[in-house]
Amino acid sequence: MFRGGAPCGMKGRHALLCESVQAAFWTSPRTNPQCPGPPRITPVRLVTFSLPMEVRGSYAGVMKTLVSKDALKRMALCVCFLSALPIAKGAEPVTIPMTAEHWQTKENAEFLRELGFYHGLMRLNSGNAVLKDITFSDGTIEFDVNTIGRGAPGIAFRQQDEDNFELLYLRPDPSCPAFRACMQYAPQTHGVLLWDLFPQYQTRAPLRENGWNHIKIVVSGRRMNVFVNDATSPTLVVGRLEGDVMKGGLRLQGPGTFANMVISPDAVDGLSPEPARDPLDGDHGLVRNWHLSTFSALPNGKDSMYNEMPRASQGWKTISTERNGLVNLSRQYGRPVPGPNRAVAWLKTTITSDSKQTKKVEIGWTRELWVFVNGKLVYADKNLFEVEEARKAPDGRCSLENGAFTLPLEAGDNEVAVAIANNFFGWGLMVRLADPEGVHLAAN
């Protein structure tokens, strides 16, 4: 085994773990009368001293033999080893030092040494820090974080670049145990963090607003479980990781102080790599298949008109819903229009009705939309997060709870066209007929 960088298979002697500027002794599985300490694998801090880390790599080897008149006089030999930072498939847990040599930082970062933190602390007052020379896919990540103020400290994993990664972040608050968005997971794709498209991955959590919190993340394929502090069952269950990448780097983001990070590659606690079943799988009322237009800029204050819908020859493509009936425009286009203007795109589908009738429709969207049936406007509304009174339930996120309206249908084929505009984070649409009897939705 290899725990915290200490080789635990040594016979009858203590291994001295050399990490940055502190050292801790580790007992071996066997007892030697010349080496004090219990016969189990546990760290015992006997001495602290300055020692530079000059060698890296797997079991870098013996660096130096150290003998002390007092603390070490009963020890025959103490051999100094370095931890192995690169994570290989099937490797044992690795402790990550919070030292400048291991992290690439942006903005305001401090590396600190305090009693009781053998591997140091990293304080991110703002910005973030990327762990060097690490590629992470599946496994367990554990760390402690002491939050600073009311920011959103967290960890990004499977980071491909600045625009694509998975993100878990905290929203410490005095009412955090009851605050629905205290802990959140969201993917970032094409440079857009999609927190407002996945409200099902935001939850209450037993976080301490002031003080240390222990976070344990288990990642397996398309799933993730998150445990907070002493929780024995997951605080947050992510049935499907929604990012576009399956492996990549690790990044911590502030504000917060981080310590005691341990990565256990491929340790997934039996968590299946397959995504959980879509809760709306088999729902025959979801409008799942659409045609999507190209995007254009829509000046603020202007409404979309039916006669502005792009012609059939102007680059339409088919698109199907993701989980929960979400049409994810951000995954297609990112945030294509800079500045104050909104990006607008059109979606259209055909609903065939057995007779002339009306149907109740549940609809979710971000941020503004206009719905036309056979060329006539039947519904328009806004779901603006930045204007609190204009937020639709649940709290400005995209959900079928956002709104409802009556859909008028003629006998035969009916064209349903939706113009949807956005300039704030996730860009998406959900449409569901409460009762699909007597209608036929477009097939894939």
Segments the model singles out, each with a brief description of its role:
Residues 126-190, 296:
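Secretory/extracellular carbohydrate-interaction modules
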Residues 242-280, 399-408, 415, 431, ...:
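Ligand-recognition surfaces built from glycine- and aromatic
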Residues 110-127, 139:
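Short carbohydrate-recognition loop motifs
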Residues 229-247, 378-391:
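Short, solvent-exposed beta-strand-to-loop segments that form ligand-recognition rims
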Residues 358-372, 416:
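Aromatic-lined ligand-binding clefts that engage carbohydrates, nucleic acids, or primary amines
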Residues 191-214:
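Short, aromatic/His-centered strand-loop micro-motif at the edge of beta-sheets
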Residues 262-354, 424-428, 433-444:
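Extracellular/secretory pathway-exposed regions associated with glycan biology
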Residues 208-237, 368-378:
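Carbohydrate-binding surfaces in secreted/extracellular proteins
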